[in-house]
A protein has these predicted regions:
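Structured beta-strand-rich core segments of catalytic domains in phosphoester-bond hydrolases
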Residues: 1-35, 139
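The start of beta-strands in P-loop NTPase/AAA+ ATPase cores
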Residues: 35-37, 72
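Conserved catalytic scaffold of divalent metal-dependent phosphoesterases
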Residues: 27, 37-47
């Protein structure tokens, strides 16, 4: 769905510079047979209203699609930083979901945004979840894999159990 007033149509939302989407899938655990939903998003990097309303729309759509009883996960580039004005947009997620970074007993504090080394490193990428348990959260520094920057963001991962 598109992060806009018309999520079912190709569109640009609110004050966004770019068109943005959230993709989702319903998966079934091969071992236990239970289903869960995974959403991935990329909020706008310029529009404050687009970030705020995009986060609210994501929560609204997750509630509608996944419901209250099924485990649900969302990750992505939220273009928001805790402790900054943009961090306020993340409250839309934490009102209904838990932060994987905060909930995992093992968690690092490495920033996810590297800007290819040309700008200040900071955390802009997050994982939120509901009806699961986070075990380990990590930002994968690509230097350990022999390539300094594969993107302007490092991957973030979290191990969960249901």
């Amino acid at each position: 769905y598109w992060l806009s007033e018309t999520p079912g149509e190709v569109s640009r939302g609110w004050d966004a510079k770019n068109r943005r989407i959230t993709v989702w899938v319903c998966l079934r655990d091969k071992v236990f047979g239970g289903k869960f939903y995974y959403f991935n998003t990329h909020l706008d990097h310029k529009g404050h209203e687009a970030r705020r309303r995009g986060a609210l729309l994501n929560v609204e759509m997750m509630r509608k699609i996944a419901g209250k009883r099924t485990p649900v996960f969302i990750s992505g580039d939220m273009n928001a930083e805790i402790g900054q004005k943009t961090g306020e947009y993340l409250k839309a997620y934490t009102a209904w979901l838990e932060s994987a970074h905060d909930a995992a007993p093992e968690s690092d504090d490495r920033p996810s945004f590297n800007g290819f080394g040309k700008s200040r490193a900071r955390t802009l990428d997050y994982i939120y979840f509901r009806r699961a348990r986070a075990l380990r959260y990590e930002t994968l520094d690509s230097e350990a894999y022999g390539v300094r920057y594969v993107s302007d963001h490092y991957p973030i991962v979290c191990t969960f159990v249901f």
